[in-house]
UniProtKB/Swiss-Prot annotation:
This is Heat stress transcription factor B-2a. It comes from Arabidopsis thaliana. Gene3D superfamilies: Winged helix-like DNA-binding domain superfamily/Winged helix DNA-binding domain (1.10.10.10). The lineage of its organism: Eukaryota, Viridiplantae, Streptophyta, Embryophyta, Tracheophyta. Residues 119-157 are annotated as: Disordered. The gene is HSFB2A. Residues 21-115 bind DNA. One of its GO terms (cellular component) is nucleus. It is found in: Nucleus.
């Protein structure tokens, strides 16, 4: 018994797969065909494309009921995987060559695109490679017009650029923006620190000049007048107390104190009493009498 050829088996499998459209296409076609929700989603005038008139209500009411989610962006991405194209940019109108009004049988011709993701491993550069400048050839996408790209020797910048060229554009852009923001903040903080250091140096210099210009005399005041000692007692009262003490301590002759009766204090002159016979050219009789007696004894 001869086995069927391999090509015939593959053709049979592919035809059986195409005979049944995917659930996503079937549900979408039924939603567009439903005339009760034409205010949300419907065909265009000639039936060659469908239009989502109200994306908010479509995501709120219809998507959870038929597709188990409420993300309109996910629905649009699903359409893109099946080859649907947006007709006009100002509204949500999508078309496909096999998605026509009244032509449900054509849905089996719509095949989902196979997404092939190529993961490129980023190898950390060695110590020798870090010290050298790396040269990377331009990418195949044609975005770079230069023949060669010279990259920095920094490992972080090399990793960011390599991540950007490998397809993870969103992540690398966010990292670059964050890095740029941190760099600008660092520059601003360094500028403020330099200004604060300058202000501190100016204050220190000003205080040094001020202290050096002051005289060493403590009695000097900025107004130019010397400070006077504080008087706790009146001068007159203090002088009277000194006079009374001196009178009590001085010897007395016939009840009259003899000795120095003149005292001086700061700014105060006390009136003194003259001693009997003081500053007089005439001698008193009793002095003359005792003087003669003394002369006789001495002779």
């Amino acid at each position: 018994m001869n086995s069927p050829p391999v090509d015939a088996m593959i053709t049979g499998e592919s035809s059986s797969q195409r005979s049944i459209p995917t659930p996503f296409l079937t549900k979408t076609f039924n939603l567009v065909e439903d005339s009760s929700i034409d205010d949300v989603i419907s065909w265009n005038e000639d039936g060659s494309s469908f239009i989502v008139w109200n994306p908010t209500d479509f995501a709120k009411d219809l998507l959870p009921k038929h597709f188990k989610h409420n993300n309109f962006s996910s629905f649009v991405r699903q359409l893109n995987t099946y080859g649907f194209k947006k007709v006009v940019p100002d509204r949500w109108e999508f078309s496909n060559d096999f998605f026509k009004r009244g032509e449900k049988r054509l849905l089996r011709e719509i095949q989902r695109r196979k997404i092939t993701t190529t993961h490129q491993t980023v190898v950390a550069p060695s110590s020798e490679q870090r010290n050298q400048t790396m040269v990377v050839s331009p990418s195949n996408s044609g975005e770079d017009n230069n023949n060669n790209q010279v990259m920095s020797s920094s490992p972080s910048s090399w990793y960011c650029h390599q991540t950007k060229t490998t397809g993870n554009g969103g992540l690398s852009v966010e990292l670059l923006e964050e890095n740029e923001k941190l760099r600008s903040q660092n520059i601003q903080l360094n500028r403020e620190l330099t200004q604060m250091k300058s202000i501190c140096d100016n204050i220190y210099s000003l205080m040094s000049n001020y202290v050096g210009s002051q005289p060493t005399d403590r009695s000097y005041s900025p107004g130019g007048s010397s400070s006077q000692p504080m008087e706790f007692l009146p001068a007159k009262r203090f002088s009277e107390m000194e006079i009374e003490e001196e009178e009590e301590a001085s010897p007395r002759l016939f009840g009259v104190p003899i000795g120095l009766k003149r005292t001086r204090s700061e700014g105060v002159q006390v009136k003194t009493t003259a001693v009997v016979g003081e500053n007089s050219d005439e001698e008193t009789p009793w002095l003359r009498h005792y003087n003669r007696t003394n002369q006789r004894v001495c002779n």
